Structures are given as C-alpha cells and as structure tokens.
Amino acid sequence: MFQLGSLVVLCGLLIGNSESLLGELGSAVNNLKILNPPSEAVPQNLNLDVELLQQATSWPLAKNSILETLNTADLGNLKSFTSLNGLLLKINNLKVLDFQAKLSSNGNGIDLTVPLAGEASLVLPFIGKTVDISVSLDLINSLSIKTNAQTGLPEVTIGKCSSNTDKISISLLGRRLPIINSILDGVSTLLTSTLSTVLQNFLCPLLQYVLSTLNPSVLQGLLSNLLAGQVQLAL
C-alpha cells in the first residue's frame, strides 16, 4: 500500500519543483518541433474531392463542397507533432466550422474567415501526465479578382493566409491536480502561440489549394453580391 509519508514527500517534491517545471515546460514549448513538417505542396494522400469543388456553380454550393472536402479529408499526417524536451502534443480532431466573407479593405477583393475548432492531448514532461485541451481559432485568407483583358474572364489571385491572433482560445478539459493547472496556466501564452502557428502552417496551404480549384466565376459572383450588399457576413 502506498504510505502516507511517501505521499507527503511526493507532494512536497511536486510543489517545491513547480517553478522549475514551469521553466522546463516553457522551454519545451518554445522548442516545439513538427515531427514530419509538410512541404509547400498539399500532401497527395489527403484524397481531396477536387471534382466536387470544380462542379460548384455558385458560392453556397461551393461553400458546402469546401466544408465537406476539408472535413472529410484524411488529415492523419497533420494531426501529430512532437517536441524536444519530452513534450508531446497531438491533435485528436479538427473541424472547419464555417466560412465568413466580407469585402477587403480596398473594396476590390474578399477576406474569407475560416473558424476552426478541435481537441488535443498534451503530455507534460517530467511528470508524465496527459491533459486534454480544446482549441479554437480563425484563419483569414484574402482573395482578389480581376478580369483578364484578353479573355474577358475573371482571374483569382489568392493572397496571404494567416491566423487571427484576436480569435485564438485554448481551454483545459477536466482540470484536476492544482500543480497541473499551475503549470498549464503558466505556459498558456506559449501554447496559444505554438498551436496557432502549427495549425496555420498545416492548414493554410490546404485551404489555398482548395480555393484555387474553384471556378473563378463563383468567386466573382460572391464579390459582386458583397459589393451589392446582398450577402450576409456568415455565408
């Protein structure tokens, strides 16, 4: 049987080393490395239904096709990454919730906002505890549309994709031991920054590839509706 005296000693060690653990965990998060970082190209094993995207003739149809394509793609290789110093972080599930569109600041393009939500498991170094966290953030991608002077057809230029730092949140699921709460609270900013960067690096190329497969006339129609004030913020 586990002796009370041993339990007291263990608790004392945990409490006494809490500041050290915070520092070590902070270092681990700062040194987070992706196990298999993706290349610039979209992985071929995602099995994206490009034909479904190309068949869309209007933005509502295209939006539904994009959501279906992204949420049914095999993202297995994008869900695991590890770090140095014993920190392991794994994305358990990830879902694209919606697409929101508004005119760009210059009025000549579209800013697409893509809300994401998911859950991850974090293995704390040195104490071997696994905790679950929920993550939500927004990706923003800009699009500009111009008419080709020779063909008279619309052409789409896909601009920068980034995460909205004002819309990132991480929540701890099933808090238990105070020492674990203290450790995670102490590195919440580091975790937020790391997760947003990793998800942005993984998902932005995929999002931009999907947008590039759409018929330009679909996005031209969306822009025309935005200019006419006929489209709500959430599409």
Swiss-Prot record:
Disulfide bonds join 161-204. Pfam families: LBP_BPI_CETP. Transmembrane segments: none annotated. One of its GO terms (biological process) is defense response to bacterium. The keyword Secreted applies. GO terms for cellular component: extracellular space. Predominates in the parotid glands, present in smaller amounts (1/10) in the submaxillary glands and in the sublingual glands, and at lower amount in the pancreas but undetectable in the liver. Found also in lacrimal gland. It comes from the Eukaryota. InterPro entries: Bactericidal_perm-incr_a/b_dom, BPI_fold-antibacterial, Lipid-bd_serum_glycop_N. Keywords: Antibiotic, Antimicrobial, Disulfide bond, Secreted, Signal. It is found in: Secreted. Residues 1-20 form the signal peptide. One of its GO terms (molecular function) is lipid binding. Belongs to the BPI/LBP/Plunc superfamily. Plunc family. Has strong antibacterial activity against P.aeruginosa. This is BPI fold-containing family A member 2. It comes from Mus musculus (Mouse). The gene is Bpifa2.
